[in-house]
Amino acid sequence: MTAVLSGEADIGFMGSESSIYTYQEGANDVIKNFAQLTQRAGNFLVAREEMPDFSWDDLKGKDVLGGRKGGMPEMVFEYILKKNGINPQKDLSINQSIDFGSTAAAFSGGQADYTIEFEPSATALEAENSGYVVASLGVDSGYVP
């Protein structure tokens, strides 16, 4: 977004929330989203152990490393929770304080019961036996704008 607003780039690849934020902050040159490259979330829920019978109810009372507050990945995660009757503010603890690029390392280091990861981090956690993909947010959310 910064490169587009500063004139360093003509087109940017980002989630729709970026243009919403800049609009709400009163940007003089409003960014317009004009194309959609994906229709589903591309991230995964990773657990500490294999869970072949995973249910979203398994997250109740657990700690999860989530995404940036207000970011599309976090919004999709919370949408799935609500769709499954889980209150994101009351039924579990979502840690949004860890930088996006550091959540897999934090999880490997013992933080939280679950983490939300994109590839290649989800597969890397499985390869090092630090975590197991138990759900696809893209499958469970359905299509997202």
Model-based region annotation:
Residues 18, 49, 99-145:
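Pocket-lining segment of extracytoplasmic ligand-binding domains
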Residues 48-64:
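Flexible hinge/capping segments at coil-to-helix
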Residues 38-46, 67-81, 101, 138-145:
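Extracytoplasmic ligand-binding site segments that recognize negatively charged/polar headgroups
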Residues 35, 62-72, 84, 89-100, ...:
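Short beta-strand->loop
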Residues 3, 8, 17-21, 58, ...:
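Extracytoplasmic/secreted proteins, especially bacterial periplasmic and envelope-associated proteins
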Residues 5-17, 26-31, 62-64, 108-117, ...:
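Alpha-to-beta junction loops
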Residues 25, 74-96, 111, 126-130:
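Ligand-binding cleft/hinge of the Venus flytrap
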